[in-house]
Amino acid sequence: MILKSFLLGNLLSLCMKIINSVVVVGFYYGFLTTFSIGPSYLFLLRAQVMEEETEKEISSTTGFITGQLMMFISIYYAPLHLALGRPHTITVLVLPHLLFHFFWNNHKHFLDYGSTTRNSMRNLSIQCVFLNNLIFQLFNHFILPSSTLARLVNIYLFRCNSKILFVTSSFVGWLIGHILFMKWVGLVLSWIRQNHSIRSNKYLVSELTNSMARIFSILLFITSVYYLGRMPSPIVTKKLKETSEMEERGESEEETDVEIETTSETKETKQEQEGSTEEDPSLCSEEQEDPDKLDETGRDPSEWKGNI
């Protein structure tokens, strides 16, 4: 009995040491970073669902993993974190990306030209898929921010003694989490494609493929608004701070004006009260003299002697 309790106590202590070890905690936080960013997965799912070519699927996966890796490194490397959050970086990344999308969506008829142009545009489309999945990860850092990504690591990093071991284990956990996520997405899509009930209804499949781009754009817009509502963009917060400061200044000026008006009104009322108190003694003296001079009938007492 004593031996069993001793073994049980040692086993529990060993389990507690393993759970509280830096490696396990690093695996845990690295695995949680897989689910910390939401909108960045939409381009990957769109490429996996809509693109039938394997090259585009591979390029989308590569761009997604590269962008996630840059985001993961920016947590631990402060210069990269500051560089991604600067307004010049936003201008350099966002404007060319939007212009390229505008040009690409309005010039799709170039794909119908000769074989050389078709091959070049095909390679360009593969590169475009890669850049979409790469750049959108960087957009999520400051345009669609998720505070979970930075807080997951900062909670434990300042308490950890062996930071290199923690970073390595969290990177391994992050990589395992993304591999599992990609495998899960592939299994779900393969099940949908192999399902006979879905494949038999060709009208439903054609309508779904035609409206897939619109569905993903709506989902992206809703998720973006949700994230921006929870944590506003740094581009907007500066203007909001300025407007709040102007409102506070206006409120303070209004309060001072109200105080000045109230003080002036109190001074006027005090002066009126003092003036009324000065007029009251004269009235009282006149009222005291009148009863001596006037009788109840209203006559003067000197008139009484004449009458007598």
Swiss-Prot record:
It comes from the Eukaryota. The keyword Disulfide bond does not apply. GO terms for biological process: protein transport. It is a multi-pass membrane protein. This is Putative protein TIC 214 N-terminal part. Residues 250-262, 275-293 have a biased composition (Acidic residues). Coiled coil: none annotated. Residues 239-249, 264-273, 294-308 have a biased composition (Basic and acidic residues). The keyword Transmembrane helix applies. Belongs to the TIC214 family. Part of the Tic complex. The chain crosses the membrane at residues 18-38, 64-84, 87-107, 124-144, 172-192, 215-235. Involved in protein precursor import into chloroplasts. May be part of an intermediate translocation complex acting as a protein-conducting channel at the inner envelope. GO terms for cellular component: chloroplast inner membrane. Keywords: Chloroplast, Membrane, Plastid, Plastid inner membrane, Protein transport, Transmembrane, Transmembrane helix, Transport. It comes from Piper cenocladum. Residues 239-308 are annotated as: Disordered. It is found in: Plastid, Chloroplast inner membrane.
